[in-house]
Swiss-Prot record:
InterPro entries: NAC-dom, NAC_dom_sf. GO terms for biological process: auxin-activated signaling pathway; lateral root development. This is NAC domain-containing protein 21/22. Residues 19-171 form the NAC domain. Ubiquitinated. The interaction with SINAT5 mediate its proteasome-dependent degradation. Induction: Induced by auxin. Its main location: nucleus. The NAC domain includes a DNA-binding domain and a dimerization domain.
Length: 324
């Protein structure tokens, strides 16, 4: 019989301690079946080349599994012998002092090189007694041999020697939080990589006083367009708008309309405002004419012939201002 010290020395945690940093015990399902469970079953009571600890699941609660079985910090690997409820039956007794393991879902096949080598059963631990047990976050994958890799019956002297390999882990919210954080980081990264989506335009909805800066120049505001595919006409509009944003036309006579005053002063100011705005629009049309001359016939055709009003409307200037 092996002493406790010998078991510790042969445990996976001790083997990992001798490996370079970064190496972890992370076997695939077929490796667990063929390279570990198969050897355990064939060696029977003899010590396999690499030993996982042995746990009696009927006498051990999931949270009491020895820490030496913990591999990688999140999974517990160990051998166990299935305790059959009846000597002549195949049903397994999975009850503990405080609860029981309940199978969930269908068993999954484990293949190696296209051949069936084992099965994996998923079980969840319930506290209390069936059928009123309370479901917990403890999950177990039970691996058993199947197919041609199953040892012959004469190698099993009793039902208790029906070996299985178990992987136990505790489901918690850490994985969800990590995924959320990753998504958040991804969203932030994606947003940071996008170019600035600011298109200048003249905003006629805001207060008139905000059109003028301290040096009485017209101010072009910025607008964030929708995320949509730009057609050829929309691209042209953007070019026209950029040209408008480069205009900085002085306003010679600031009007009472912008600073407040009486009704008569406001009407007088409105006439002066329209006159001043016409200066802006003339300069604007001059710029548009230059751009229209540089466009091909197909590009300029979409605006119509002599449709100055449609040009002004497309870049955000209402026709009511032009008709002052």
């Amino acid at each position: 019989m092996e002493t406790e010290e010998e078991m510790k020395e042969s445990s996976i945690s001790m083997v990992e301690a001798k490996l370079p940093p970064g190496f972890r015990f992370h076997p695939k399902d077929d490796e667990l079946v063929c390279d570990y469970l198969m050897r355990r079953s064939l060696h029977n009571n003899h010590r396999p080349p690499l030993v996982l600890i042995q746990v009696d699941l009927n006498k051990c609660e999931p949270w009491d599994i020895p820490k030496m079985a913990c591999v990688g910090g999140k999974d517990w690997y160990f051998y166990s012998q299935r305790d059959r409820k009846y000597a002549t039956g195949l049903r397994t007794n999975r009850a503990t002092a405080t609860g029981y393991w309940k199978a969930t879902g269908k068993d999954r096949t484990i293949l190696r090189k296209g051949k069936l080598v084992g099965m994996r059963k998923t079980l969840v631990f319930y506290q209390g007694r069936a059928p009123r047990g309370r479901k917990t976050d403890w999950v177990m994958h039970e691996f058993r041999l199947q197919g041609s890799h199953h040892p012959p019956n004469h190698s099993l002297s009793s039902p208790k020697e029906d070996w299985v390999l178990c992987r136990v882990f505790h489901k918690n919210t850490e994985g969800v939080i990590c995924r959320d954080n990753m998504g958040s980081c991804f969203d932030e990264t994606a947003s940071a990589s996008l170019p600035p989506l600011m298109d200048p335009y003249i905003n006629f909805d805001q207060e008139p006083s905000s059109y003028l800066s301290d040096d009485h120049h017209y101010i072009i505001n910025e607008h964030v367009p929708c995320f949509s595919n730009l057609s050829q006409n929309q691209t042209l509009n953007s070019n026209l708008t950029n040209s408008v944003s480069e205009l900085k036309i002085p306003c010679k006579n600031p009007n009472p309309l912008f600073t407040g005053g009486s009704a008569s002063a406001t009407l007088t100011g409105l006439d002066s405002f329209c006159s001043s705005d016409q200066m802006v629009l003339r300069a604007l049309l001059s710029q548009l004419t230059k751009i229209d001359g540089s466009l091909g016939p197909k590009e300029s055709q979409s605006y119509g012939e002599g449709s100055s009003e449609s040009l002004l409307t497309d870049i955000g200037i209402p026709s009511t201002v032009w008709n002052c």
